[in-house]
A protein has these predicted regions:
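Catalytic-site beta-strand/loop segments enriched in glycine and acidic/polar residues
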Residues: 107-122, 162
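A structural signal for small-residue-enriched, beta-sheet-centric alpha/beta enzyme cores
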Residues: 85, 106, 124-128, 137-142, ...
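Structured core elements
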Residues: 16-18, 30-32, 39-41, 60-62, ...
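A short glycine/serine-rich beta->alpha loop
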Residues: 79-83, 116-125
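Buried hydrophobic packing segments
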Residues: 94, 98, 132-141
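Glycine-rich, charged/polar anion/phosphate-binding loops
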Residues: 15-18, 24-27, 45-47, 99-101, ...
Length: 239
């Protein structure tokens, strides 16, 4: 079957990462994955959470969608006086994904908050937030290195994420909203640059799926993540 935007089944949407989009944040970027656009900023504070051992740092994330990021306006979380359950789940995922490649002892007594604000959502907002959030975090670490706040980069590698799914029994990479909403199976994958899995979230939306189908989706994601990490490298090396 042909895809909505004419892509091959194993092809990413057009990806662009624009660094240093916010002059006030220690690190920032705008990531565009097709029609999904996410603003990612990294803020540095010298107050790690209380649960963190003395001398260690922490990386956390917050995620939200602008009211008109989708086809219809949604209410802001603040107007409901509570965090949307979906947003809470996604920001925990982003934080876990980024912490997986951070050496908290090398980070030292610093708290890094990654804010991911979806300007426009067309599927894959959580995975775009992880991919862009990593770039924002690395730019913040660079600024900290220049200021003498870090002795070395406290990361073990790159991290990126992408989705895949089965639509009309066909495995596809990087689903847009229309594909995602009609997918039989939906899977999100986070990996480091050594091909190691950090998190896999798979759901049988319309039917159960086999281990072979899951493996095919993970392989599609691995291909896409390698390409995303090359984009991350080019952006960070050009700075």
């Amino acid at each position: 079957m042909s895809r909505i935007d004419g892509r091959k089944n194993d092809e990413l949407r057009t990806v662009e990462i624009i660094p240093n989009i916010n002059k006030f944040a220690e690190g920032s970027c705008l990531i565009r994955c097709g029609n999904t656009h996410v603003l990612c900023t990294a803020s540095v504070e010298d107050r790690p959470p209380r649960h963190v051992p003395e001398g260690e740092g922490w990386v956390t994330a917050e995620y939200s969608m602008l009211p008109r990021a989708n086809r219809e306006r949604s209410r802001r979380d603040i107007s409901k006086l509570k965090l949307n359950g979906r947003s809470a789940e996604i920001q925990r995922l982003i934080g876990r994904a980024l912490r997986a490649v951070v050496d908290r002892k090398k980070l030292g007594p610093w708290n890094i908050t990654i804010d991911c604000d979806v300007l426009q959502g067309d599927g894959g907002t959580r995975t775009a937030s992880i991919t862009g959030g990593f770039v924002a975090m690395m730019l913040a670490f660079r600024k900290m290195m220049e200021a003498g706040q870090l002795a070395e980069y406290p990361v073990s590698g790159y991290v990126a994420a992408v989705s895949a799914g089965i639509v009309d029994d066909v495995p596809m990479l990087d689903l847009c909203y229309e594909e995602d909403s009609s997918a039989m199976v939906d899977l999100n994958c986070v990996m480091d640059d050594r091909g190691r899995l950090i998190e896999v979230q798979g759901t049988g939306e319309e039917r159960p799926f086999t281990l072979e189908e899951q493996q095919r989706l993970v392989e599609l994601c691995a291909k896409g993540i390698r390409e995303l990490q090359e984009i991350q490298r080019r952006v960070l090396e050009d700075r």
